[in-house]
């Protein structure tokens, strides 16, 4: 039986501080210096042809169900290959499954998964569509930390940041023809914003219990962090239930669920 989802594909890059442009220029200088040294020493080099636009690029595919969400992330980072002065790709492929039942973190490259990873891919987790999550200040872990006078100020700062990140800016934009609501993201590196659409037959809500924004992410912009923009968005699309449980594939090792991870 298929599962009804909203599916968005986003592409972007890490701006960073120093900026992507500055760090890319620094890498080019390091490559040129490496080539010069190796050629003078008579060593073999592999000259770089086309250069990437971004030092760290990312692609995300997010599938929103009515009671769960899974995000597939691929990150490609370019570094100097000391063997021949070429560029080397460091690629990570991960997925995180989240619902009211807990979180499962999946490393697609090493075929490992940890956390709350039931075989049904959180299909039986309680639905909380269109419901605002519990206030962050109700978190028991924070309450315990706040009892320590040395941590009280830090906890208050965390609560203030999270509370402000839950506030909409009141602005609206259009991405891929879909109207979305802009939310401030002060906790993002350097601050930022995210735009969520509430279009479709259901409105997915953030299910971590740490945020009130609802909808499908179409745009995320952080001053020093990642800048992601939707390149494809499909509402009310039917997919296989296997999308929510990649760790059920042969060869995966799933760790025992820890109570603290639920």
Write out the residue ranges for each language-model feature.
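Extended soluble regions of mature proteins
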Residues: 1-262
């Amino acid at each position: 039986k298929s599962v009804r989802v909203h599916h968005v594909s986003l592409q972007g890059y890490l701006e960073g501080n120093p900026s992507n442009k500055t760090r890319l220029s620094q890498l080019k200088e390091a490559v040129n210096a490496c080539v010069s040294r190796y050629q003078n020493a008579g060593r073999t080099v592999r000259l770089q042809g086309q250069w990437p636009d971004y030092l760290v690029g990312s692609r995300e595919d997010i599938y929103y169900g009515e009671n769960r969400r899974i995000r597939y992330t691929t990150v490609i980072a370019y570094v100097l290959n000391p063997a021949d002065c070429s560029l080397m790709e460091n690629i990570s492929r991960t997925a995180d499954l989240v619902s009211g039942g807990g979180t499962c973190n999946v490393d697609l490259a090493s075929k490992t998964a940890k956390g709350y990873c039931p075989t049904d891919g959180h299909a039986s987790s309680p639905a909380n569509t269109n419901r605002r999550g519990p206030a962050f200040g109700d978190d028991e872990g924070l309450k315990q930390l706040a009892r320590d006078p040395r941590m009280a100020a830090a906890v208050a700062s965390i609560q203030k940041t999270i509370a402000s990140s839950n506030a909409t800016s009141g602005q609206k934009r259009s991405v891929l023809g879909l109207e979305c609501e802009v939310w401030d993201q002060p906790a993002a590196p350097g601050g930022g914003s995210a735009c969520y659409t509430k279009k479709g037959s259901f409105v997915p809500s953030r299910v971590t219990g740490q945020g009130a924004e609802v909808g499908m992410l179409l745009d995320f912009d952080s001053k020093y962090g990642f800048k992601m923009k939707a390149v494809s968005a499909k509402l009310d699309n039917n997919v296989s239930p296997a999308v929510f449980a990649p760790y059920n594939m042969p060869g995966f090792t799933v760790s025992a669920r820890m109570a603290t991870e639920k």
